Every structure is written in structure tokens, then in C-alpha cells.
UniProtKB/Swiss-Prot annotation:
Family named by the database record: Belongs to the chorismate synthase family.
Pathway: Metabolic intermediate biosynthesis; chorismate biosynthesis; chorismate from D-erythrose 4-phosphate and phosphoenolpyruvate: step 7/7
Co-factor binding comment: Reduced FMN (FMNH(2)).
EC assignment: 4.2.3.5
InterPro entries: Chorismate_synth, Chorismate_synth_AroC_sf, Chorismate_synthase_CS
Self-association state and partner proteins as the record states: Homotetramer.
Gene: aroC
CDD domains on file: Chorismate_synthase
CC per GO annotation: cytosol
Keywords tagged on the record: Amino-acid biosynthesis, Aromatic amino acid biosynthesis, FAD, Flavoprotein, FMN, Lyase, NADP
Annotated stretches, region: Disordered: 41-60
Highest rank taxon of the organism: Bacteria
Identification of the protein by name: Chorismate synthase
Annotated positions binding FMN: R125, S126, S127, N238, A239, G278, K293, P294, T295, S296, S297, R319
Length: 370
């Protein structure tokens, strides 16, 4: 199986399966000399880990990260950093009924057709369990970006099923299990999820991710544009069915006089471009939206086929998230960080000495909405 590595200079290769002994990532290309301990990584893993509320999977995994290499006396050495997370709460017997059948909406059928073998236990390699090492690697990337440029990467849920979650304040996000930036709507979201769980069904979500204090100039046109690589990384996240940068699909309805963000000496008037023009960062906030589909594993019986092609009915008994989008925010943050750090190193390699006389304008003109 190929396709397990993200990045060009700062690379992340993940390994493991949902019900194997461990999962992990090898981070290569991290610059030497950065302070790094497990504690720098654990915070983001704790935000993503299962079993943190009644609204997510009840699989109890501590997700304690171990740094096996690439760090000496508390500093990165420039050699590959191996991050290991041991699986401790597998319940493979829950999947005995799908050994010979394919779950609708899952990778069961496609993995079988492509490889001729599949690990049916919790989805194996295709499980969202494999996002844990992505988050661990992303924490390393976040730390480097923060120390080099003051870059801050944050995310929140803006929609749960049919319920819009209006943005109020960033301070609300860590205070609820939905990563909602609006505390007032949390009771409604909890009632909604309780009803969904009783019905044995699932729902999708929309996630917003914002990177602030991003340097100007990141991105490699034409085919390694920054927005193209962001979309590529985000589409590698389980259950993502759509990615928008900036105004996204709303751009279709806008006139050019509205969409084109005007430049002034005091800053940009608007950010419909989402912080990227011509595939290169402008220094404005990079804004990304993700559409996440409903969880395919539900208790409701579904029609399918078995390996022989015969009709079959599939019921899923494992422990699953009624909405995988609830835990997706820290994963999306990690992916954005990984793309940005890779492009920061690529920019430094080719254009680090480039100087122009034109001053860099502020990301936002005074009086413009944030």
C-alpha cells in the first residue's frame, strides 16, 4: 500500500491499524534544535481522543504518545521522529458479523476489490483511529510554526447536521465537547445528539479551520499551490466530502467587484480569497471549511452483499461516533499545520533570500470585519 506519506520536505508517514497493537507516525524533516517533549504533543491528542463525552465513541483509549527517536536531551535532532501510540481497548469480536459482508458507506468493498485482503476489525487501516498519529505529528508542526512566525491554528464546528452553530468567541471552543464557538447553543446540540443516538442513526458536520499570522509567500505554483495542497491533505481525512478555501462555493454568487479583495496601504479589504492568491499565501488568515459526511457505521440494518455477491443485511455493533465531525477539529488543525510547515521549509529553501521594496501590507484594513 502506497499513499501513506504527506509532505515533501517535512514529511509524515503513518502506520498501524485500528485493532493492531499500536499506531504511529514518522516525522522526517523537522528542523533540529526545537524543544520537544511528549507533553508538547499530548494536549492535542487529548482533544481528539475517544470516550471524552457521551456524544462520541465509547472506546476508551488513553492515546499516550511515546517519542521513540529524533529527540535528544529534549531537543529535535533533525533525524526522523517516531511517535508511537499503543492501542489498549480493541474489541474485535464486535466485528465478527462483517467478516464476509461489506458495510455500506465504508471502505470494506473497495479495500477488498483493490488488495484482495482486508482487516475487518474496526476498519483496519481505513479507520479514523489512524487520525491520532496525524494529530501527534501536527502538534510538532504547530509548535515549529508558532515559534518561527507566531502562527496560530484554531478550528471550530460551524454546523451539526441541520443545526447552524454561529460563531461567538474562540474562548467557547475548549469548553464543550462539540468544539462549538458558541456556548448558548450547546444544550440544543446535546439534545439533538441524544435523539440521534436513540434512533441508531448518524449525522454530518461542517468544520472551520483558521491559520493566523501566516508568512507571505508560502505556496509553489502551479501544481503545488498552497490551496491545492491544503485541499489534498484535508481530503485525506476520513469522511471529508468537500473542502472550501475562503468564500468557497459562495464565490459563484459573488460579483467580481465584491469577491476581489481590495488592497490598501492599511491592509486588505476583505478575505474572500481565504488568505491565498495565485496559490501563494497573502499574510491574511487562511480559512478552510470541511464538509464531513454522516458516520457510515449505524445500528439501523442496511442492505449490502457478501463476498460471493449475494444479498445480505448488515448491522453494526461496534462503538462508533454518531458524528465523526465532533472530533474532527483538532485533526483538521493538524493537517493545516503540516501543509504550512512543509511549504515554509520549501519557501525558505528557494526564496529565503528574496527581498522586494514593496512593504507588506497588514492582513486586514482598519474597520474591516474579522
Amino acid at each position: 500500500m502506497s499513499g501513506n506519506t504527506l509532505g515533501l520536505l517535512f514529511t509524515v508517514t503513518t502506520f498501524g491499524e485500528s485493532h493492531g497493537p499500536a499506531i504511529g507516525a514518522v516525522v522526517d524533516g523537522c528542523p533540529p534544535g526545537m524543544d520537544l517533549t511528549e507533553a508538547d504533543i499530548q494536549g492535542d491528542l487529548d482533544r481528539r481522543k475517544p470516550g471524552t463525552s457521551r456524544h462520541v465513541t465509547q472506546r476508551k483509549e488513553p492515546d499516550q504518545v511515546e517519542i521513540l527517536s529524533g529527540v535528544f536531551e529534549g531537543k529535535t535532532t533533525g533525524t526522523p521522529i517516531c511517535l508511537l501510540i499503543r492501542n489498549t481497548d480493541q474489541r474485535s469480536k464486535d466485528y465478527g458479523n462483517i467478516v464476509e459482508t461489506f458495510r455500506p458507506g465504508h471502505a470494506d468493498y473497495t479495500y477488498w476489490q483493490k488488495y484482495g485482503i482486508r482487516d475487518y476489525r474496526g476498519g483496519g487501516r481505513s479507520s479514523a483511529r489512524l487520525t491520532a498519529p496525524v494529530v501527534a505529528a501536527g502538534a510538532v508542526a504547530k509548535k515549529w510554526l508558532r515559534e518561527q512566525f507566531g502562527t496560530e491554528i484554531r478550528g471550530y464546528m460551524s454546523k451539526l447536521g441541520e443545526i447552524e452553530v454561529p460563531f461567538s468567541d474562540w474562548s467557547h471552543v475548549p469548553e464543550n465537547p462539540f468544539f462549538a464557538a458558541n456556548a448558548d447553543i450547546v444544550p440544543e446540540l446535546e439534545t439533538y445528539m441524544d435523539a440521534l443516538r436513540r434512533d441508531g442513526d448518524s449525522v454530518g458536520a461542517r468544520i472551520e479551520v483558521v491559520a493566523s499570522n501566516v508568512p507571505v509567500g508560502l505556496g509553489e505554483p502551479l501544481f503545488d499551490r498552497l490551496d491545492a495542497d491544503i485541499a489534498h491533505a484535508m481530503m485525506g481525512l476520513n469522511a471529508v466530502k468537500g473542502v472550501e478555501i475562503g468564500a468557497g462555493f459562495k464565490s459563484v454568487e459573488q460579483r467580481g467587484s465584491e469577491h476581489g479583495d481590495e488592497l490598501t496601504a492599511q491592509g486588505f479589504r476583505g478575505n474572500n480569497a481565504g488568505g491565498i492568491l495565485g496559490g501563494i499565501s497573502t499574510g491574511q488568515d487562511i480559512t478552510v471549511s470541511l464538509a464531513i459526511k454522516p458516520t457510515s457505521s449505524i445500528r439501523t440494518p442496511r442492505e449490502s452483499i457478501d463476498k460471493a455477491g449475494n444479498a445480505a443485511t448488515v448491522e453494526t455493533f461496534g462503538r462508533h461516533d454518531p458524528c465523526v465531525g465532533i472530533r474532527a477539529t483538532p485533526i483538521a488543525e493538524a493537517l493545516l499545520a503540516l501543509v504550512l510547515v512543509d511549504h515554509a521549509l520549501r519557501h525558505r529553501a528557494q526564496c529565503g533570500d528574496v527581498k522586494v521594496d514593496t512593504p507588506r501590507i497588514p492582513a486586514q484594513a482598519p474597520g474591516q470585519p474579522g
